[in-house]
Amino acid sequence: MTEQRTIASSATREDEAADASIRPKRLADYLGQQPVRDQMEIYIQAAKARGEAMDHVLIFGPPGLGKTTLSHVIANELGVSLRVTSGPVIEKAGDLAALLTNLQPHDVLFIDEIHRLSPVVEEVLYPAMEDFQIDIMIGDGPAARSIKIDLPPFTLIGATTRAGLLTAPLRDRFGIVQRLEFYSPQELTRIVIRSAAILGIDCTPDGAAEIARRARGTPRIANRLLRRVRDFAQVKAAGHIDLTVAQAAMQMLKVDPEGFDELDRRMLRTIVDHFDGGPVGVESLAASLSEERGTLEDVIEPYLIQQGFLIRTARGRMVTPKAYLHLGLKPPRDSAPAIGEPGDLF
């Protein structure tokens, strides 16, 4: 099993506690994702002008990009309360009914990991989203009867990292669909500078930029790296973070300039050394790395693919010339092209 990685995009308890203190409250403070911000500003203002609940919103994208944060910002901008839950927590239809019946008019209900809702719960959610009504079964056996309960108009915000796992009926009931993209190093630098200021960390712009460029395009990772570099600086540099201190801290953490850690490099080197650069099936690769298939597909691969170090083909995974060069190796003449180069397999 994979231990918690410093550059993992999944949230830890420390992340959740820290995020609460640095989470932006308004769209003006929500850095990056400019197209999403521009659209949501229009939808929010229009809903407020009409005095209506905003349409239901589906937010999807890799973990750590700010889906939960965006839901808080939306509720704050609408001036309503936010109720937060997740798909696995809502086990029965009654659990969902309890949440819905306690909402006030125009409130926002945020369901994280919405793709993990059970079919029974989804069936209750459909009329709630469309008609602001739910049907509840009272009693058992022949005496059971259905009672229709009216709900106040509300906005459902669903978040998922696996949009493809949503059922079509659920997906079609969202009037607003937003995809969050990986952040640029420049955007992450602004986020690191903002977080450092809020947390009272002495960090220079070049130190922030060094942290940002190793954060895999993900604010959650950038903020976590900032906290680890702060620890390093507190012991080794009197609490001051500059370029040199940030680089030394990253070397200690074994996070290279591309944002890769030992597991990323081990995966690339395994494909090169054991499978001649690929293609290799994901099951064989998982066995070689002693990792679960889901860990490879959901945790390790997305960033390697997005950065052009790895490609998926019908025959399996292949590394690109860029991966060979990163490992200090000379690419073979017949190695897979990097994403976007001539001969791209997609």
Swiss-Prot record:
Protein's UniProt name: Holliday junction branch migration complex subunit RuvB
Region (Small ATPAse domain (RuvB-S)) residue spans: 184-254
Domain notes: Has 3 domains, the large (RuvB-L) and small ATPase (RuvB-S) domains and the C-terminal head (RuvB-H) domain. The head domain binds DNA, while the ATPase domains jointly bind ATP, ADP or are empty depending on the state of the subunit in the translocation cycle. During a single DNA translocation step the structure of each domain remains the same, but their relative positions change.
Catalytic activity: ATP + H2O = ADP + phosphate + H(+)
Subunit structure: Homohexamer. Forms an RuvA(8)-RuvB(12)-Holliday junction (HJ) complex. HJ DNA is sandwiched between 2 RuvA tetramers; dsDNA enters through RuvA and exits via RuvB. An RuvB hexamer assembles on each DNA strand where it exits the tetramer. Each RuvB hexamer is contacted by two RuvA subunits (via domain III) on 2 adjacent RuvB subunits; this complex drives branch migration. In the full resolvosome a probable DNA-RuvA(4)-RuvB(12)-RuvC(2) complex forms which resolves the HJ.
Segments of this protein annotated with the region Large ATPase domain (RuvB-L): 1-183
Any coiled-coil regions, as ranges: none
Segments for region (Head domain (RuvB-H)): 257-346
Enzyme class: hydrolase
UniProt record, GO biological process: DNA recombination; DNA repair
Binding site for ATP: 22-23, 64, 67-69, 130-132, 173, 183, 220
Binding site for DNA: 293, 312, 317
Keyword Nucleotide-binding set for record: yes
Region (Disordered): 1-20
Family: Belongs to the RuvB family.
Subcellular location: Cytoplasm
GO cellular component, one term: cytoplasm
InterPro entries: AAA+_ATPase (IPR003593), AAA_lid_4 (IPR041445), DNA_helicase_Holl-junc_RuvB (IPR004605), P-loop_NTPase (IPR027417), RuvB-like_N (IPR008824), RuvB_C (IPR008823), WH-like_DNA-bd_sf (IPR036388), WH_DNA-bd_sf (IPR036390)
EC number annotated for this UniProt entry: 3.6.4.-
Record function comment: The RuvA-RuvB-RuvC complex processes Holliday junction (HJ) DNA during genetic recombination and DNA repair, while the RuvA-RuvB complex plays an important role in the rescue of blocked DNA replication forks via replication fork reversal (RFR). RuvA specifically binds to HJ cruciform DNA, conferring on it an open structure. The RuvB hexamer acts as an ATP-dependent pump, pulling dsDNA into and through the RuvAB complex. RuvB forms 2 homohexamers on either side of HJ DNA bound by 1 or 2 RuvA tetramers; 4 subunits per hexamer contact DNA at a time.
Major subcellular location class: cytoplasm
Gene Ontology terms for molecular function: ATP binding; ATP hydrolysis activity; four-way junction DNA binding; four-way junction helicase activity
